[in-house]
C-alpha cells in the first residue's frame, strides 16, 4: 500500500511567506501609483512589463510624453526615495529600450524616467525625471 502524503506539507515550490507578502505589497503599491498618475492626467499604457533586463512597473503616457515609472513602497516616503539604486536605474533604462523595441509606435515620444513613492497613511509622491538615461 502506498503511503499518502501529508496534505499540510508545503508544495515543493511554494513561495516563502515574506516573498508572498512583498509581492502583494508591490501589487498594491503599483495600483495606488497608477490611480494617482491617472488622476494627474496620465494614461497607463503598460503594467509590470517583463523584459530580459527586468520589469518596468508602469509605463504612463500624457500627450507626447512617455514615462517609465518605478514604484517604491516603504514604511516612510523618505526611505522609498533612496530605494532606486544606480544599478536598478540601469536595469530600468535597459528594460525601457526593450519596451520601445516592442512598441515602435512610441519611438517619437519624449521619454522620461519617473518614480512614485508609496508609504502607508501618505499620499503617493510622484518624482518626475527621478533619473535620466544619459551616461
Swiss-Prot record:
Family: Belongs to the UPF0102 family.
Organism: Rhodopseudomonas palustris (strain BisB18)
Pfam families in the record: UPF0102
GO MF annotation list: nucleic acid binding
Superkingdom of origin organism: Bacteria
Cystine crosslinks: none
Protein name: UPF0102 protein RPC_0320
Amino acid at each position: 500500500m502506498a503511503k499518502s502524503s501529508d496534505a499540510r506539507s508545503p508544495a515543493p515550490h511554494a513561495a516563502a511567506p515574506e516573498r508572498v507578502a512583498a509581492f502583494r505589497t508591490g501589487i498594491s503599491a503599483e495600483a495606488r501609483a497608477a490611480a494617482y498618475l491617472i488622476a494627474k492626467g496620465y494614461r497607463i499604457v503598460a503594467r509590470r512589463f517583463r523584459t530580459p533586463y527586468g520589469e518596468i512597473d508602469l509605463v504612463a503616457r500624457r500627450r507626447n510624453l512617455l514615462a517609465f515609472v518605478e514604484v517604491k513602497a516603504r514604511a516612510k516616503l523618505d526611505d522609498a526615495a533612496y530605494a532606486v539604486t544606480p544599478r536598478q536605474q540601469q536595469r530600468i533604462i535597459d528594460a525601457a529600450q526593450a519596451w520601445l523595441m516592442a512598441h515602435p509606435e512610441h519611438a517619437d515620444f519624449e521619454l522620461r524616467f519617473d518614480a512614485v513613492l508609496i508609504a502607508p497613511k501618505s499620499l503617493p509622491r510622484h518624482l518626475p525625471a527621478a533619473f535620466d538615461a544619459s551616461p
